[in-house]
Amino acid sequence: MVKIRLKRAGRKKLPVYQIVVADARSPRDGKFLEVVGTYQPTAKPHAVTIKKDRIVYWMQTGAQPTATVNSLIRTTGLLYELRLKSMGRSEAEISAEMEKWQEHQAVRRQKRLALKSHRRSAKKEAEAKAATGGEA
């Protein structure tokens, strides 16, 4: 069975992963068939680059992505695009849907960042309140 999975590269405490197509029996950093992308988890935000045409080719030939790679592919919108193609949508409809999807993802990202900053400020206020309340 052929898998699309991560292969670790980089150095100690600074991982960079290659998204590779490999036989399921080969070790994590062992032999592989093709490099189809990269993933940098330490970048802010996480950097994912993929070769969409090669991933589509390998998935059509039966390669199974691992759970982690599947979630990375999903964040790029490739699985949604493939689903639209399988539903028989035209290229114009697919591009319009993908634009809507990207806008929706940008809005979700902004909401998450706003919530994160709100939580940080609330935590700082609570700490300041506890510090002043403890001295009095």
From Swiss-Prot:
CC terms in the record's Gene Ontology section: cytoplasm; small ribosomal subunit
- Tell me if Transmembrane helix is a UniProt keyword of this record: no
**Gene3D superfamilies annotated for this entry?**
3.30.1320.10
From the UniProt entry, list the residue stretches annotated as the region Disordered: 113-136
What GO terms describe the biological role, i.e. biological process, of this protein? translation
Query: Mind listing the UniProt keywords for this protein, alphabetically?
Result: Ribonucleoprotein, Ribosomal protein
Name the Pfam families on file.
Ribosomal_S16 (PF00886)
UniProt-recorded name of the protein: Small ribosomal subunit protein bS16
Give the source's domain of life in one word.
Bacteria
Q: What HAMAP family does the record tag this protein with?
A: Ribosomal_bS16 (MF_00385)
The answer to whether the entry has keyword Cell division is: no
Its gene is: rpsP
In what ranges is there compositional bias, type Basic residues? 113-122
Concerning its family, UniProt says: Belongs to the bacterial ribosomal protein bS16 family.
Q: Which SUPFAM superfamilies does the UniProt entry name for this protein?
A: Ribosomal protein S16
Provide the species name: Pelodictyon phaeoclathratiforme (strain DSM 5477 / BU-1)
Which GO-annotated molecular functions does the record name? structural constituent of ribosome
The signal peptide annotation in the UniProt record is none
